[in-house]
Amino acid sequence: MKELQDRILKDGQVIGTNILKVNKFINHQVDPVLMEHIGEDFANHFADKGITKVVTIESSGIAPALMAAAKMNVPLVILKKQPSKTLHNDLYQTQVTSFTTEKSYELTLSRDVISEDDNILLIDDFMADGEAATGAIRLLRMAHATVAGIGILIEKSFQPGRRKINEQGYEVYSLARIKYMDEYQIDFIEEN
């Protein structure tokens, strides 16, 4: 998605060679117009998949996932990273380690919001090592739901996430695929 790539080049900040800071438009300050366009793109790409729910992991995936869910006219389910007083029993849980923070957390899904009849579009802001997506897929498998596709805003293609997810048999559709980045440049994989 050229609009997202352009915004990454304009406002993204590379830290080292593997962290991309996008706090000016995705995960601290959110650009609602960009999120709407992202939601439209995901909705169009997955239009023929019979999606019944969009799922994301809190918190940076919420805005684009909500826009996609709205465009598809389906509910959004948010997988929780933090314990909650309202989510305390009848849960699916799995441990996930974040690439960015290098911390583990219990990813949680309430059993009453996903069923075996659901056809899921999983949306996340980044894909690096594929750990978050793999954890989300584990939870959705526990619920016997079908993962129809995975939508990623920014994929760091020089890391193994896409390969790991593809090896599990899932389609990954990324709006911006970065093949290389450092403090001075960001190179994208151009899709045909």
Swiss-Prot record:
InterPro entries: PRibTrfase_dom, PRTase-like, Pur/Pyrimidine_PRTase, Xanthine_PRibTrfase. This is Xanthine phosphoribosyltransferase. The keyword Glycosyltransferase applies. Xanthine binds at residues 20, 27, 156. Homodimer. GO terms for molecular function: xanthine phosphoribosyltransferase activity. It comes from the Bacteria. Pathway: Purine metabolism; XMP biosynthesis via salvage pathway; XMP from xanthine: step 1/1. GO terms for cellular component: cytoplasm. CDD domains: PRTases_typeI. Keywords: Cytoplasm, Glycosyltransferase, Purine salvage, Transferase. It comes from Agathobacter rectalis (strain ATCC 33656 / DSM 3377 / JCM 17463 / KCTC 5835 / VPI 0990) (Eubacterium rectale). Signal peptide: none annotated. NCBIfam families: PRK09219.1, XPRTase.
